[in-house]
């Protein structure tokens, strides 16, 4: 493994939740492990505290940003959507922390990799909108995991194919044109954000991957959980390794 002094600092988005009367900021261990290997970066947890008046700008020190999945959904107010159905889980603190941070990272050309909720945050940060409940749309299938599955291997098993855009970034990184991916999301991209391009779609037309059009900026979002299962599949490993390479390049250029 590379010397720690040469490894990039990669911010990982945390979620705020409560346990009893105590608020917590949490990150699933699988995201931390994915940054340690195969990305070979140093994971830095970014707490969801911007709603409490924090003035810390994490883009000042990170060399990359990993947007994690979450049980929560982006609030419709962030993209001028209709109010959520009662009972929909939201994380106000994460929305107020991560969406502005994504925009600052794009301005500074800091590499970004978004997973599941992360691709949705990237799309909203770029001015796009979301389908709040894909499973309610007549021409779409249910992209959620089975509610009765509590076994990780079954929950994260491949659920459907995606068709990868020929000649696109994801195609160039992985060399693949069609693969099976897991599927654990209720929301999905509706209107594509500014300066984003489609990298992959599901059989029902739901956007499964996007990238930033600017060749000088690495920003890739995927709708599946590329970090799981472990060991990471070869297809997903290529994504993380490329992300790590982009983060190292950013860190080196920052020193110049």
Which residues make up each language-model segment?
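Conserved G/P- and acidic residue-centered "switch" motifs that form tight phosphate/ATP-binding loops
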Residues: 116
């Amino acid at each position: 493994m590379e010397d720690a002094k040469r490894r990039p600092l990669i911010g990982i988005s945390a979620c705020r939740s409560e346990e009893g009367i105590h608020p917590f900021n949490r990150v699933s261990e699988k995201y931390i492990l994915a940054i340690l290997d195969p990305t070979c970066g140093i994971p830095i947890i970014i707490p969801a505290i911007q709603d409490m008046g924090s003035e810390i700008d994490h883009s000042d020190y990170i060399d990359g940003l990993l947007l994690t999945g979450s049980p929560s959904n982006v609030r419709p107010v962030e993209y001028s959507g209709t109010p959520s159905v009662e009972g929909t889980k939201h994380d106000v603190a994460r929305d107020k922390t991560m969406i502005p941070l994504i925009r600052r990272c794009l301005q500074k050309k800091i590499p970004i990799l978004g997973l599941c909720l992360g691709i949705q945050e990237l799309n909203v940060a770029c001015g796009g909108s979301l389908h709040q409940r894909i499973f309610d749309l007549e021409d779409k299938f249910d992209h959620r995991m089975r509610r009765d599955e509590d076994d990780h291997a079954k929950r994260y098993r491949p659920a459907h194919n995606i068709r990868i855009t020929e000649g696109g970034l994801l195609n160039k990184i992985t060399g693949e044109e069609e693969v099976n991916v897991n599927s654990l999301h209720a929301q999905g991209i509706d209107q594509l954000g500014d300066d984003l391009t489609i990298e992959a779609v599901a059989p029902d037309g739901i956007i499964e991957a996007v990238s930033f059009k600017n060749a000088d900026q690495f920003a890739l979002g995927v709708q599946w959980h590329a970090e799981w299962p472990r060991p990471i599949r070869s297809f997903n490993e290529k994504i993380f390794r490329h992300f790590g390479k982009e983060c190292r390049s950013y860190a080196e250029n920052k020193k110049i």
